[in-house]
Amino acid sequence: MKLNKKIGLIIIDGLGIGKEDNTNAVHLANPPTLNYLINNFPTLQISAAQQNIGLLENQAGNSEIGHLTIGAGRIILNDNANINNYMKSVDYESAVLSNIKNEIVHIVGMYSNGLVHSNYEHIHWIIKQIIKNNNQVVLHLISDGRDDYPYGFAQFIEQINALKKQYNIIVKSLSGRYFAMDRDQRWERTQKAFNAMFVKQDKICEKTFLEVAQSIANSYKSDEFVQPVVFNDDEKYNLKPHQKVILANYRSDRMRQLAHLLKPNKKFHYNNPFLVQDVNLITLVPFPDVDAIALFEKQNLNNTLGDVFNKHQIKEARIAETEKYAHISFFFDGGVNKYYSTKTQYLIPSQKVATYDLCPQMSAHLITKTIIDHYFDHDVFIVNYANPDMVGHSGNMQQTIEAILSVDHEIRKLYDFFEKNNGVLMITGDHGNAEMMLDDQKQVITSHSVNDVWFIITDNKVILNSTQKFSLANIAPTILEYLNIAQPIQMTATSMIKKICE
């Protein structure tokens, strides 16, 4: 199918709409290109959080559910909510867990209230299932500090100690997510976390779990950066062949490297020097390219935007840097890896820096160059610029401003190029972050927000419906109406277009 215009769906990660004050890096950046587009083209403020995209009340959006919702064109029950429904069912009992008897079972999970990658209540549920059959639980904790408050882990100390006593749990290790949940193949980080969890150490931490947890605020930039520590060096609690490891995070992108160190797969080429043979891996939901038994099924999403493009032989390009590559591929396609002859995916390597506030421009210029270089090869471009989110997570206001201005500069180049070459940009965010860097007490916020995001279309022939509240779910139907393509019945959201003038 030949399109009259090329479309660029530009997702600016972590760019929300906030108060116009000094807590808002977007306001302080005063990005000239975005300001120009907002003031001169059809624009709406749309929801990227809470019930409007299938989350809980007051729950912030995130990149996974954001891209999932944009690609699906409908409100989706996310993994957290889906798992909760199973766990709350009186009749539900996991056949997998109930068959584990008289064993040592390792549980790895991020103990957080952020609900982006994990839910600490899921760890509780797994423990309760496991201890029914005379099993010994060895717990490997991951601290957050990124999707939760920077030092939010301290609030869980009493709760974790109560769990230890009630169920005779061994808390063997603690690692910040910076190490345990890397997703950019910085294997030295993942290996360090793995070693603390599963490998015999020459030296263990001289402090107790309680002492370490209480001292994080004085020792680290945030919970995210806690160095992997070992609290128990008893040989019998090191990982052995044929033992079971349960990964209690439901989101796969930041667990796949650790999973690879436990059970190697063809996706990665890194070799674990301390590989334990024949480990039995269990996950909450299926992880792509991971050899594991899943406790719960994921929803099967058909007729996503990518499916529709493929059906109509529309050539699309998916472009993002490493940090967000899974979002414009796996998540955008409904939480599965789909391969179409009509789709080309371009992976732009992320900069190799410790944290992105050290390089706020990231690889944005290479993303833009890739779009322009391949403009005439494709009909539609699905693009993610990661800067406001990845730098916003650092809590560094000035560098987040730089990140926003870097993306704004790239948007200017894209707008000029698309305008000259019969193209239209549709610009949005997947969730808020950079617009809310400080709370009312001027304390740093590193997590996402519940704020709305922009939807901009650079075509003044389009009149958007300003009388209705829309969300990320309405973007796919809007694209299809703009292209005059019938919307599949599975896309239950509606288009935001009121009228297209001749």
Swiss-Prot record:
Q: Which annotated residues bind Mn(2+) 2?
A: 13, 63, 430-431
What's a GO biological-process term for it?
glycolytic process
Highest taxon of source: Bacteria
Keywords per UniProt: Glycolysis, Isomerase, Manganese, Metal-binding
EC annotation from Swiss-Prot or TrEMBL? 5.4.2.12
Q: Which cofactor does it need?
A: Mn(2+)
Please list the GO terms describing molecular function.
manganese ion binding; phosphoglycerate mutase activity
The entry's substrate-binding residues are 117, 146-147, 177, 183, 251-254, 324
Q: Does the keyword Acyltransferase apply?
A: no
Q: According to its UniProt record, which reaction does this protein catalyse?
A: (2R)-2-phosphoglycerate = (2R)-3-phosphoglycerate
- Cofactor mode of binding and number, as noted: Binds 2 manganese ions per subunit.
- UniProt-annotated binding residues for Mn(2+) 1: 389, 393, 448
Q: Kindly report, in one word, the top-level EC class recorded for this enzyme.
A: isomerase
Q: Name one Pfam family in it.
A: Metalloenzyme
The family this protein is said to belong to: Belongs to the BPG-independent phosphoglycerate mutase family.
NCBIfam families linked: pgm_bpd_ind (TIGR01307)
- This protein is called 2,3-bisphosphoglycerate-independent phosphoglycerate mutase
What is the protein's species of origin?
A: Ureaplasma parvum serovar 3 (strain ATCC 700970)
What gene name is listed for this protein? gpmI
